[in-house]
Amino acid sequence: MIKVLVLHGPNLNLLGVREPNIYGRVDFQTLNNLILQKAKEREIEVEIKQSNFEGQLIDWIQEYRDWADAIIINPGALTHYSYSLRDALLAFGKPVIEVHISNIYKREEFRHHSVIAPVALGQISGFGVNSYLLALEAIFLYFNK
């Protein structure tokens, strides 16, 4: 069975409340339930974590290194400047998919650059909460090619 660590970065716990015109009205718990449902359909075991702290995300990447076959991460604003998060994902050494609910390339200029994307298998953005489900599907296909 494929094992995936799903990491939600800063402010993602406020889904459904924070800027619903950008991030939608699906709340955080509903998103996690959708992820669990999709994972069950594909027989993928998932562990879901959220933190507003960069160091905690890095600790989880290191802690789950032996357990996880892949990581799905929405780094939030850390996408644009967190070289320590980037380095932790690189050290993970297995597939990483960067996800974003909004299309970061249709937003403010500072959001157009990701320091995470160069160390990721791929990036999925702009599909709302479905970005996470598409990432799970991509991981399933990656391991079942």
From Swiss-Prot:
TM ranges: none
A single GO molecular-function term is:
3-dehydroquinate dehydratase activity
- In short, the EC number is 4.2.1.10
Which Pfam families does this chain map to?
Answer: DHquinase_II
The family database entries (SUPFAM superfamilies) matched by this protein are listed as: Type II 3-dehydroquinate dehydratase
Does Metal-binding count among this protein's keywords?
Answer: no
Q: Which residues are listed for substrate binding in this entry?
A: N74, H80, D87, I101, S102, R111
Q: Which UniProt keywords apply?
A: Amino-acid biosynthesis, Aromatic amino acid biosynthesis, Lyase
InterPro entries associated with the record: DHquinase_II, DHquinase_II_CS, DHquinase_II_sf
**Biological processes annotated in GO:** amino acid biosynthetic process; aromatic amino acid family biosynthetic process; chorismate biosynthetic process; quinate catabolic process
- Give the site residues for Transition state stabilizer: R18
Cited CDD domains:
DHQase_II
Task: Report the enzyme's class at the first EC level.
Answer: lyase
Pathway in which the depicted protein is active: Metabolic intermediate biosynthesis; chorismate biosynthesis; chorismate from D-erythrose 4-phosphate and phosphoenolpyruvate: step 3/7
Catalysed transformations (reactions):
3-dehydroquinate = 3-dehydroshikimate + H2O
Q: Identify which residues the record assigns to the active site.
A: Y23 (proton acceptor), H100 (proton donor)
Q: What quaternary structure, including any partners, is listed in this protein's UniProt entry?
A: Homododecamer.
Concerning its family, UniProt says: Belongs to the type-II 3-dehydroquinase family.
What is the annotated role of this protein in its UniProt record? Catalyzes a trans-dehydration via an enolate intermediate.
Name this protein carries in UniProt = 3-dehydroquinate dehydratase
- Which organism was this protein described from? Dictyoglomus turgidum (strain DSM 6724 / Z-1310)
